[in-house]
């Protein structure tokens, strides 16, 4: 029988002192916790260190993908669980992870179902649940891509095995902070697309925006999530509008990017 694989929990963070304690406590059972701080101005570093994390700093921001790559490079154990400060590993998910570590398939990647919080409600529809993300994998085999935002784990043709148990994701606790983050993501998405030679027309802005609302509200049953479902459909449409309008503006030199 093979011995248990060891686990490094890895995260990138900036100004997350308020969220880090519950996050780190939910993974305190791991063999190692790595936090790569990108220049916090609050007590994030001290909080992480006080809870047993190994903290490193890198302020030359080149996007989420490369920051995750660097964070993983500090991990010294067999498996990596990549998480964010606004996520929590539930006891059920921990049990699933422990089962993998006791009987691993190193060629596989394991996905977690995220339960996303939006304005006081953990969403069950709207495309926000189960919201599976590939987060548990063999350290020596897989890395994140270079994308500035919405980065993904490069898994090739690896088998993806779903884990049981949810990961809680406190996505939208503060509406204004959430809006600011969405605007930043839209800007980075448009910048990356523009650099890759992508362009869009005026009509494309409108069709993608309308499509985002219909997809969230109707096709993904957002109406079953009540008021929050309707608000999320509008927010998704707004985010999509910002992405494509920014790409349109960049293509016509209406931006300094």
Curated annotation (Swiss-Prot):
GO biological process, one term: lipopolysaccharide core region biosynthetic process
Top-rank EC class of the record's enzyme: transferase
Biological pathway: Bacterial outer membrane biogenesis; LPS core biosynthesis
Keywords assigned by UniProt, alphabetized: Glycosyltransferase, Lipopolysaccharide biosynthesis, Transferase
InterPro entries: Glyco_trans_2-like, Nucleotide-diphossugar_trans
Keyword Glycosyltransferase annotated: yes
Catalytic activity, EC: 2.4.-.-
GO MF annotations, alphabetized: glycosyltransferase activity
A Pfam family that the UniProt record links to this protein: Glycos_transf_2
Leader sequence segment: none
Family: Belongs to the glycosyltransferase 2 family. WaaE/KdtX subfamily.
Name listed for the protein in its UniProt record: Lipopolysaccharide core biosynthesis glycosyltransferase KdtX
Species this protein is from: Serratia marcescens
């Amino acid at each position: 029988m093979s011995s248990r694989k060891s686990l490094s929990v890895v995260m990138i963070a900036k100004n997350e002192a308020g969220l880090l304690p519950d996050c780190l406590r939910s993974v305190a059972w791991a063999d190692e916790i790595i936090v790569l701080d990108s220049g916090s101005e609050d007590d994030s570093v001290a909080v992480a260190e006080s809870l047993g994390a190994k903290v490193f700093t890198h302020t030359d921001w080149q996007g989420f993908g490369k920051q995750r790559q660097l964070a993983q490079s500090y991990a010294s154990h067999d498996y990596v669980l990549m998480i964010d400060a606004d996520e929590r590993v539930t006891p059920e998910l921990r049990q699933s992870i422990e089962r993998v570590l006791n009987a691993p398939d190193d060629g596989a990647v394991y996905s977690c179902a995220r339960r996303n919080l939006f304005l006081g409600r953990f969403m069950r529809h709207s495309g926000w649940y189960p919201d599976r993300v590939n987060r548990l994998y063999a350290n020596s085999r897989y890395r994140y891509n270079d994308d500035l935002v919405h980065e993904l784990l490069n898994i090739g043709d690896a088998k993806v095995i779903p884990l049981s148990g949810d990961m809680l994701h406190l996505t939208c606790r503060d509406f204004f902070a959430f809006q600011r983050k969405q605007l930043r993501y839209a800007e980075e998405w448009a910048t990356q697309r523009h650099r890759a030679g992508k362009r869009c027309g005026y009509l494309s802005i409108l069709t993608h925006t309308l499509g985002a609302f219909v997809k969230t509200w109707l096709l993904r049953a957002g109406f079953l999530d009540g008021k929050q479902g309707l608000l999320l459909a509008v927010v998704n449409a707004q985010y999509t509008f910002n992405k494509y309008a920014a790409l349109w503006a960049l293509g016509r030199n209406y931006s300094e990017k």
